[in-house]
Amino acid sequence: MLSRRLITGPILILILLLVVWWDDWLGPVAFGETQLAPGIALLGICMVVAALAVLELCTIAEATGRSTSPMLTIFAVEVLLIGLWGGSAETNTGVVLLVIVATWFASLWQHACGQRTKGVLNDAAATTAITLYVGGCLGFFLLLRHDVSAWWIAAVVLITKSCDIGAYFTGCSLGRHKLIPWVSPGKTVEGLIGGLALAAGVAVLASCLLASYGYKDISWPMAIVLGVLLGLAGQAGDLSMSLIKRDAEVKDCSDTIPGMGGVMDVLDSLLLAAPVAWLCFR
């Protein structure tokens, strides 16, 4: 498992860096007199990842006895992402509310058209929750792109994931006290501390590196705070997904990514880190 992760991890990082480089190189794309919002490459990768994540979550929901609509959910998530990417501060709230309300009623009426009434409340709630979980959280990366460069988006991802790496290796070597064993038996308090320390260090390194290239500069104390907050958010996101998987009695969301499980197994920590990063840079 570890050997596969050591191969898959660098490949995923390379893909991330290529997307970020492309996004930064493109900048705000213009069509005639119309200038699109920055982050069009980021939007593209978010839409692909979101679709895969929705399929996994819908499968997990099915395992818990809920009947979801994958195509409806994917459509709603993509509309939400596009709306947040191209919207403004004045319209974003309306976009989110409109998509959530539309998804809720569309799910209800999909059941009605299929002449199904049993479990309709739980099924519609699951469809709407997945839409908000994936689309709403990923959308914060697109909102963050309005305020910072694409390279800071990459930094947020790497800082968050560095906490996962630090927690894993520290926990394996020094872990003694279980963190929340009924949710994730492998996580330890010592691992969390080690992960947060590494995340803080990576945040300081990233802030210094990006500042040297003329990107948004933050002080090293703020970088430490950012690293700790992203690390905590990432671990909370990981544990949240573990809770959902325990309900469905599955270990991994799928086997899409060798050595790491499914898309949601990689994405889980980032989904909660995204809104935290957006708040930190406001």
Model-derived features with residue positions:
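Re-entrant/interfacial helical elements at transmembrane boundaries that shape
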Residues: 171-173, 243-249, 271, 275-276
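Transmembrane alpha-helix interface/packing and boundary motifs in multi-pass membrane proteins
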Residues: 229-234, 255-258
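Juxtamembrane boundary at the C-terminal end of a transmembrane helix
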Residues: 278-282
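Hydrophobic alpha-helical transmembrane segments in multi-pass membrane proteins
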Residues: 195, 199-203, 234, 270-277
